[in-house]
């Protein structure tokens, strides 16, 4: 059994039609006292200019629904791909390097210790102390 799937454009149009048809709400307390209240505006008289504007608005709203947001620009994507390729290829091409001197290894450790000390050090500004009291 082969089932055909409808295309995405028809699904979007069907969802929009269902949404616009379901704007009628039931209002009332009991089963017999329900009233149909329509919150839709009456359609304005259609002129050729209005219909063109409506058609443009429909197409632009469909484009916004269908196109996902781009998180990376083209330049940042090229940089990301280039950096990834270099990190994969350079270790295979370069010869193994000797370890750095011991004193050079202490530099990042010293920077980390300095940042930890500065993070827990109280500030000397009385204004900053007032700000921290309001949050505690």
Curated annotation (Swiss-Prot):
Its main location: membrane. The keyword NAD does not apply. It is found in: Membrane; Nucleus; Cytoplasm; Endoplasmic reticulum. It comes from Brassica rapa subsp. pekinensis. Residues 72-123 are annotated as: Organ Size Related (OSR) domain. GO terms for cellular component: endoplasmic reticulum; membrane; nucleus. This is Protein AUXIN-REGULATED GENE INVOLVED IN ORGAN SIZE. The chain crosses the membrane at residues 77-97, 101-121. One of its GO terms (biological process) is cellular response to auxin stimulus. Coiled coil: none annotated. Induction: By auxin (e.g. NAA). Belongs to the plant organ size related (OSR) protein family. Keywords: Cytoplasm, Developmental protein, Endoplasmic reticulum, Membrane, Nucleus, Transmembrane, Transmembrane helix. Promotes cell proliferation-dependent organ growth. Mostly expressed in cotyledons and young siliques and, at low levels, in roots, rosette leaves, leaves, inflorescence stems and flowers. The lineage of its organism: Eukaryota, Viridiplantae, Streptophyta, Embryophyta, Tracheophyta. InterPro entries: ARGOS/ARL/OSR1 (IPR037468). It is a multi-pass membrane protein. The OSR domain is sufficient to promote organ growth.
């Amino acid at each position: 059994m082969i089932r055909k799937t409808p295309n995405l454009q028809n699904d979007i149009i069907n969802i929009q039609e269902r949404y616009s048809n379901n704007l009628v709400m039931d209002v009332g307390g009991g089963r017999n006292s329900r009233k149909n209240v329509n919150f839709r505006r009456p359609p304005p008289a259609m002129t050729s200019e209005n219909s063109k504007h409506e058609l443009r608005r429909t197409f632009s709203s469909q484009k916004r629904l269908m196109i996902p947001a781009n998180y990376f620009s083209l330049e940042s994507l090229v940089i990301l791909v280039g950096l990834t390729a270099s990190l994969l290829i350079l270790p295979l091409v370069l010869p193994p390097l000797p370890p750095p001197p011991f004193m050079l290894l202490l530099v990042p450790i010293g920077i980390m210790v300095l940042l930890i000390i500065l993070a827990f050090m109280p500030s000397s500004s009385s204004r900053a102390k007032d700000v921290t009291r309001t949050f505690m």
